[in-house]
């Protein structure tokens, strides 16, 4: 494989927070773990989803029509569903494996639902819920919250996550496509850290920095992980990048400055 995934993700990161071709971006992230596997068939699968939903768009008059069309295609014809048998399987956050197995985490499936919904002319955004990842669909002035992990079912108000209840509706807001991609990668990173695999966590953090190079907290995490595995020069550079991006006086800036000073004393 050429450097296409890295080049693609670098350009994506430099372009800002989106909207992006989010499903393609998720595939490119997965391709970094499968350098010998051709991406073309997976991109063709995304194109088929897009073409099918575009053909349905004229029939989508209300957001509920669109939600049903998504369910019929993704859950019905294609068989996508949440992996309730082995939720923590790392393949559930690897978009290539998700396409192969038709199983995934809420955020991975959500990316496919976002891809399909946008092809049909709807607005689709992930929501910043702390628990289960859900999507908000909007069309012609109406909106609906759906759960990709459970077959794309609509979530009525009684069963909304706490952050989305009517009396707390302002607590959960739509997030950028970059935030959704970071959430996907963070699932893998947390599993790596839980398994004590610092090298894997470091590689995943590099990818997160690639798609969101303006985020100081990611540079801080990259510095800490580099330091933990003994790559001190890279840790120093990452602390400096964090300081360049974090506003002076903020806790993150102060902590990075202290740790950088300590690291420089070790390097001298």
PLM regions: where:
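A structural boundary/capping signal
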Residues: 1-268
């Amino acid at each position: 494989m050429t450097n296409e995934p890295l080049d693609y993700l670098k350009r994506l990161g430099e372009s800002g927070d989106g909207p992006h071709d989010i499903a393609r971006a998720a595939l490119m992230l997965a391709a970094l773990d499968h350098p010998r596997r051709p991406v073309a068939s997976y991109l063709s699968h995304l194109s088929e989803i897009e073409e099918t939903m575009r053909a349905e768009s004229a029939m989508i008059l209300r957001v509920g029509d669109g939600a049903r069309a998504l369910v019929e295609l993704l859950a019905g014809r294609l068989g996508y569903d949440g992996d309730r048998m082995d939720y923590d399987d790392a393949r559930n956050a690897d978009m290539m494996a998700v396409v192969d197995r038709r199983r995934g985490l809420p955020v991975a499936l959500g990316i496919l639902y976002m891809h399909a919904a946008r092809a049909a002319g709807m607005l689709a955004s992930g929501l910043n819920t702390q628990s289960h990842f859900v999507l908000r669909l909007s069309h012609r002035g109406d909106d609906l919250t759906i759960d990709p992990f459970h077959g794309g079912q609509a979530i009525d108000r009684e069963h909304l996550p706490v952050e989305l209840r009517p009396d707390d509706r302002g607590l959960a807001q739509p997030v950028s496509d970059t935030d959704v991609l970071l959430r996907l990668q963070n699932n893998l990173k947390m599993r790596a850290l839980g398994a004590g695999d610092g090298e894997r966590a470091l590689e995943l953090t590099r990818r997160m920095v690639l798609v969101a190079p303006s985020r100081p907290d990611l540079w801080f995490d990259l510095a800490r992980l580099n330091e933990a595995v003994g790559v001190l020069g890279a840790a120093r550079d990452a602390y400096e990048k964090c300081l360049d991006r974090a506003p002076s006086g903020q806790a993150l800036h102060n902590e990075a400055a202290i740790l950088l000073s300590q690291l420089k004393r070790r390097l001298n």
